Design a protein with these regions (language model features):
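Glycine-rich cofactor phosphate-binding loops and adjacent beta1-alpha1 units
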Residues: 158-165, 186-187, 202-274
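Mid-domain Rossmann-like dinucleotide-binding core that forms the NAD(H)/NADP(H) cofactor-binding site
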Residues: 135-216
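C-terminal hydrophobic helical "lid"/dimerization subdomain
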Residues: 3, 284-341
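NAD(P)H dinucleotide-binding glycine-rich loop of Rossmann-like/cofactor-binding domains
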Residues: 90-166
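Glycine-rich beta-strand-centered segment in the early N-terminal region that forms part
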Residues: 23-35, 50-93, 132-134
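Short, hydrophobic beta-strand segments that form beta-sheet elements in well-ordered domains
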Residues: 5-7, 70, 191-197, 211, ...
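Residue-level marker of beta-strand positions
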Residues: 65-67, 82-83, 120, 172, ...
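Short glycine-/small-residue-rich Rossmann-like dinucleotide-binding loops
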Residues: 36, 74, 89, 230-234, ...
Length: 341
């Protein structure tokens, strides 16, 4: 069959290409239905990545957050029409120690490999996780981002000491909101503190016990463990603030992505005996746990619906441009594309 793939060939330039695919393989064929734009996609779309990176990664189809319906499954795992979340990480080897999302040989969609802006996506059955029938598809569209926070939480549970009375979350954006929400549900008795720089964003964190502007943190604030969800150059200040306020022997999870190296106060990391770990991307197991959390705590999807800042029907390439340009103006929330190509 001929599959149409909508590739970014240069910043703000998307073209359709044609890819001949066979149905006589072990791949499940999925028709995308709802996709969500990520900051990483925007960096490619706007050309804010380095010229070297763009030359290496483009052309490629963007988007690694999305759901779709199964059209054909030779494995018999999914019935035709089943709504599934697509896992963008594609490992090429197995390792007993290193997780598939940390293997340097793994391929990640919309990062040098075609993402979900296609008529049909071809994936192995183990790259798909069924979506609950009653889940809002606009929320399900960015399940991948939620699974990233779930992955960080799963790693935390293995690394951190068991005194989990107070948590601090730095970052008032989408990832900070999701991470804080998960902590609220998984540790309902713990005190949840959120730190950010924009009051209008902090107002969304109604489930937190306390919210603080990063320039107005009381001297007596403290917490057992912290999660950095800032990214960019701002992650430097967030990490160092966390180091200042965290109780000794606490654990710090770093989730924010920065293009540049940042300076952190290693002296106090040593002095306080802190555990610092990085967390990136996710696995099918994280997607599965995310779906379980959606069903165990129905108010999680309800809260996440507050992140849907705009929904665009995509019927032509110009609609993709409109969605991306609109997303650039959003200070908070996720832009969702209903894929009708």
């Amino acid at each position: 069959m001929i599959n149409q793939v909508y590739q970014l060939v240069a910043p703000r330039q998307i073209e359709v290409t044609y890819d001949e695919r066979s149905l006589n393989t072990d791949r499940v064929v999925v028709r995308p239905t709802y996709l969500s734009i990520c900051h990483a996609d925007q960096r490619y779309f706007t050309g804010s990545r380095s010229a070297e990176v763009l030359a290496k990664k483009l052309p490629m189809a963007m988007i690694h957050e999305g759901i779709g319906k199964v059209v054909h499954d030779p494995s018999g795992t999914f019935k035709k029409g089943t709504l599934v979340a697509m896992v963008p990480n594609t490992p090429t080897e197995e390792d007993d120690i290193i997780g598939e999302n940390y293997l340097r040989t793994s391929r990640f969609r919309s990062s040098g490999y075609d993402g979900y802006m296609q008529d049909y996506v071809f994936l192995k059955a183990d790259r798909l996780v069924e979506v609950p029938a009653d889940l809002d598809p606009e929320v399900a569209a960015f399940t991948e981002l939620v699974s990233v926070a779930v992955h960080a939480l799963t790693r935390f549970e293995k690394i951190a000491h068991p005194r989990r009375e107070t948590f601090g979350v730095w970052g008032d954006g989408n990832l900070g909101f999701i991470t804080a929400l998960l902590l609220r549900k998984v540790y309902p008795e713990a005190k949840l503190l959120v730190f950010g720089k924009t009051q209008s964003k902090l107002d969304y964190f109604s489930f937190a016990d306390e919210t603080y502007h990063i320039d107005q943190i009381p001297a007596d604030v403290s917490f057992n463990h912290g999660f950095e969800c800032v990214g960019g150059i701002g992650s430097q200040y967030a990490i160092n603030q966390m180091i200042d306020y965290i109780i000794p022997e606490g654990t710090m999870a770093l989730l924010g992505v920065s293009e540049d190296a940042v300076a952190i106060n290693t002296r106090m990391i040593l002095e306080k005996g802190l555990r610092v770990y990085g967390s990136s991307r996710s696995t099918p197991a994280d997607f599965a746990r995310t779906m379980e959390l959606y069903q165990t705590y129905p108010d999680i999807p309800a809260y996440l619906s507050n992140l849907v800042s705009g929904v665009f029907q995509i019927r032509q390439i110009e609609d993709i441009h409109k969605a991306f340009e609109n997303d650039l103006t959003n200070r908070f929330g996720k832009t969702v594309m209903e894929w009708c190509m």
